[in-house]
Amino acid sequence: MKCYHDDFKTLAFNQNRIIQGYLSRIPERTVRIRIRDEKGFLTIKGNTNKSGLSRFEWEKEITSKEAESLLILCEPTIIDKIRYEVRLGQHVFEVDEFFGDNAGLIIAEVELEHETEIFEKPIWLGEEVTGQIKYYNSQLSKHPYNTWKS
């Protein structure tokens, strides 16, 4: 979901700087390298299901040095963002504010128990973009937000 203003920042109980790149961006298996707060991660994601709401994901922690070395091998563009965590009722929203080639884009995500679960929508939440591939981080690294036509 897109966000239209930054009220979420004052509500955040946690925030992390995230730098990430992709060794592979094909939909069947996206391979991501991420550095988050001095920790490295290697993540493999499978295809998204038909509803666009879930997919297989495997992640392994690696050293930040290993992640830095692997980022050099990644396809352009590297994603740079701050993730804010905002609790609302029983749910935690992860709100990503992007920088660099994706500056100006803010996207929120909430993990649900099942696809039809009802959740409280905060006033700062905007348009629903779930399942729209252009908003996937892997696609933002390939077709950055600043290249989109309005």
Sequence positions of predicted segments:
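Phosphate-end processing signature that detects enzymes handling 5′-triphosphorylated RNA
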Residues: M1-S150
